[in-house]
Amino acid sequence: MNTVFSNIANAKITEKSLNAVWMDLFKSADEVLMATGYVSNDAVVELHKILELNDHIQKIDLLVGMHYLEGFSHLQYDSLCKLNDFLRHEKRGAVYVSPFVKFHGKMYSFKNYQKINGLIGSANLTCFWDSTERTYETMLHLNGKPAQILQADIQSTIHKLGKNIQEVERPSKFIEHNSHLENCLGVQKIAPEQIRQLFAQTSEYHFSIPAKTEEKSNLNVFFGEGRRDKRGFVKPRPWYEVELIVSKDITSQEGYPVLKSFTVITDDGWQFQCKTSGDYSKTSTQKMNLKTLGKWIKGRLESHGCLQNNEKITHETLREYGNESF
């Protein structure tokens, strides 16, 4: 029994971070029980993809305890319903919600053959997928008899509080607020007046970068090949990960930030850092690769109803949105 911490920023307390401990247990498990308060759309999409790619995880039961009474976004609800359909069709588990009371706990149980580990503490499911999250979490790591007791407690919680998401009434109202960037590390919100002043100025340099819609790169990195570790576990690319591959005729222009970091300020008031990378002397492209950038791009498309879960960005997507360049 020991505590584990997020270890983000300058506060490294334990040797292994909470994310590393959770993911190691998850990768080696054949059965997983999860009871969490909140989930993000991207965490559910990525969990679904992982289960498609790794069939050694035989069963997952997931209880989402807060959203049914507090409110879902359309994307959250849709991704959970799709995950539930997949799990039930494959006979590998189900997704549950709490329609009677708000459940705010965070409990996880991992069974690897007969060995059981557990985690209980402050971290919602989202924390284990989102490397941009700024919230510092801590959990208690259990094994042996305490882990077996926690497993039984999670099963009891799901049984007593949970109803399958398809067996409860569909929500009549959804939350449409786009908060993808609000809790991200390195992201600031800029006052509207400052944004108006900045965008009223004439830029010294101006670049129009086409939004490319290749099947498995650029804005569709999620659909590229996942990362396979030594044990054969395949982890998909993050849903919000993107890369903008910029052609040499743009990168060679005066003022383009070659191999350096720069500050991004968006028209809807977000500020964060990006950087260009790539071997300028050997290739005709450079990359701006950042999950925060992807949250902004895909978040805009999602909030305008142009992009759905597990859907590729196409020219039609961009035309529907009304902009095909940056």
Swiss-Prot record:
**EC category name:** hydrolase
Enumerate the GO terms in the molecular function aspect.
type II site-specific deoxyribonuclease activity
Q: Which domain of life is it from?
A: Bacteria
Biological process according to GO? DNA restriction-modification system
- Coiled-coil region list: none
Spell out the reaction equation it catalyses. Answer: Endonucleolytic cleavage of DNA to give specific double-stranded fragments with terminal 5'-phosphates
Gene3D superfamilies membership: Endonuclease Chain A
Q: Does the keyword Hydrolase apply?
A: yes
UniProtKB keywords: Endonuclease, Hydrolase, Nuclease, Restriction system
Q: Does the keyword Protein biosynthesis apply?
A: no
Return the EC number: 3.1.21.4
Function according to Swiss-Prot or TrEMBL: A P subtype restriction enzyme that recognizes the double-stranded sequence 5'-GCSGC-3'; the cleavage site is unknown.
The protein, known as: Type II restriction enzyme NgoFVII
**Gene designation:** ngoFVIIR
